[in-house]
Regions:
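S-adenosyl-L-methionine-dependent methyltransferase catalytic module, highlighting the catalytic core
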Residues: 3-6, 12, 34-35, 53-98, ...
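Conserved alpha-helix/loop element of class I SAM-dependent methyltransferases that forms part
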Residues: 5-23
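Conserved class I S-adenosyl-L-methionine
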Residues: 22-31
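Short acidic/polar active-site loop segments enriched in Thr and Asp
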Residues: 23, 46, 124
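Conserved SAM-binding loop of SAM-dependent methyltransferases across substrates and taxa
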Residues: 32-44
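Conserved SAM-binding motif I beta-strand of class I
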Residues: 47-52
Length: 201
């Protein structure tokens, strides 16, 4: 079961995927398959690959796929692998999604993730979402805590924009950041999204 906030986040990601016109999509850090299942329900998406390092969560995703029609399942592949290691076999996708993933990585792994995704896989588009730390008071999160015990960090919007801009400049992508999951006039949304598009496609 997903929360209303997570459903809103997934809807924003699906809308962004539609913006790109992607026909094949990578879900990097797919977890139990929340996004994969929703992508599989869309006939315009021809191929979906989910990557997850947690074998138990991947098994759950596999089990959930069995509830889909056979034609939808046939368009999905799942694999257990690290997101911070380069996988040339995953090159050539139209779009890669990292939904609330980067905040679970130790800071030292962020650069490895950048190299793996933006230098090796180099999808035409990359969609990244992460919590907006500025919004935490609205959710009742104390100032000295993060939203989830597994989070290594939570960035405010300026920090996220700096990271996204740096990645784009280093790897030949353009990027646009936006608020998602709410629009507080001062604090933005509960989550934030960066949509990267490879330059010179």
């Amino acid at each position: 079961m997903t929360t209303a906030l997570h459903e809103e986040r997934l809807a924003a990601v699906l809308a962004a995927v539609a913006e790109t016109g992607a026909r094949n999509v990578l879900d990097l850090g797919c977890g139990a398959g929340d996004l994969v299942l929703r992508l599989a329900e869309r006939p315009d998406i021809e191929r979906i690959t989910g990557i997850e390092i947690d074998a138990a969560r991947l098994r759950l995703a596999e089990a959930r796929l069995k509830d889909l029609p056979e034609a939808a399942c046939a368009r999905v592949q799942l694999a257990c692998a690290s997101l911070t290691q380069a996988h040339p076999v995953l090159a050539g996708y139209d779009c890669a999604c990292l939904v609330e993933v980067i905040e679970h990585l130790p800071p030292a792994d962020i650069n490895r993730l950048e190299r793996a995704v933006f230098a090796t896989m180099r999808p035409a588009h990359v969609i990244v979402t992460t919590p907006n730390a500025e919004y935490n008071p609205v959710l009742g999160v104390p100032a000295h805590r993060m939203r989830h015990p597994g989070h290594q960090f939570e960035w405010d919007r300026p920090r996220f924009a700096r990271w996204a801009g740096g990645v784009a400049a280093r790897t030949g992508y353009a990027v646009a950041c936006r608020d998602i999951c709410g629009a507080h006039p001062d604090l933005g949304g509960a989550s934030q999204m960066a949509l990267f598009s490879r330059s010179g496609r």
